[in-house]
A protein has these predicted regions:
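Conserved beta-strand hairpin/beta-sheet module of binuclear metal-dependent hydrolase folds
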Residues: 2-45, 129-146
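Metallo-beta-lactamase
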Residues: 85-139
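Short, surface-exposed connector motifs at secondary-structure boundaries
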Residues: 52, 73-81, 135-140
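Metal-dependent catalytic neighborhoods of phosphoester/phosphodiester hydrolases
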Residues: 66-76, 92-99
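Pre-active-site segment of Zn-dependent metallo-hydrolases
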Residues: 20-55, 60, 67-72, 149-162
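A short helix->loop->beta-strand "cap" motif at the edges of active sites that frequently abuts
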Residues: 21, 76-82, 102
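Active-site environment of divalent metal-dependent phosphoester hydrolases
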Residues: 31-32, 60-65, 90-93, 111-114, ...
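Active-site-proximal loop/helix segments of hydrolase catalytic cores
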Residues: 68, 125-166
């Protein structure tokens, strides 16, 4: 079993890297959002994107789905990158991600989706927000970010993943 690093980039953005492949969640590297009312404590510079194969977006708020950062990633990488988004009936986000030149996969709610040899994720939506449970080898992580889960959703997650490690 290979070693996997989880690194906080900033805000809700973090990277999971096994040394060969990386996935980044909710990338927002620089700039302001919400009519210039929010900014990062420190803008992110010099991120190694060479192993980036996947981007996962939790929801459509600009501090999680930051279009300028997606454009930056596309302009500064040569590899094929798959963007993973929660399933939505409205396909605007999927269509715009594809227009940027990314591949895009929608994952169905409450079902585990195998990303690669070391990672699988499941999404648990609440309205426009989503929590992700991800499994790295034999460890279970919950990324709730700003998603408020109902009691029933917590029970569903607990039933599917009896032991959350982190």
């Amino acid at each position: 079993m290979s070693s996997v690093d989880i690194k906080l980039i900033n805000h809700a953005c973090f990277m999971i890297d096994d040394g060969k492949e990386a996935i980044i969640f909710d990338p927002w590297f620089k700039g302001k959002v919400f009519n210039d009312s929010w900014s990062l404590l420190q803008e992110t510079e010099n991120i190694d994107l060479s192993k980036l194969k996947y981007i996962a977006i939790t929801h459509e708020h600009p501090d999680h789905l930051h279009w300028p950062t997606l454009k930056y990633i596309k302009q500064n990488t040569n590899q094929i990158i798959n963007v993973i988004v929660p399933y939505r009936k409205n396909k605007n986000v999927v269509n715009n991600i594809k227009k940027l030149g990314f591949k895009c996969a929608e994952i169905l709610p409450n079902k585990e989706f195998k990303i690669n040899h070391f990672l699988s994720i499941a999404n648990y939506p609440t309205g426009h927000d989503t929590a992700y449970v991800f499994k790295i080898h034999d460890k279970i992580y919950l990324n709730q970010n700003d998603c408020i889960l109902s009691h029933d959703q917590c029970l569903l997650i607990k039933n599917q993943y009896p032991k959350i490690d982190y």
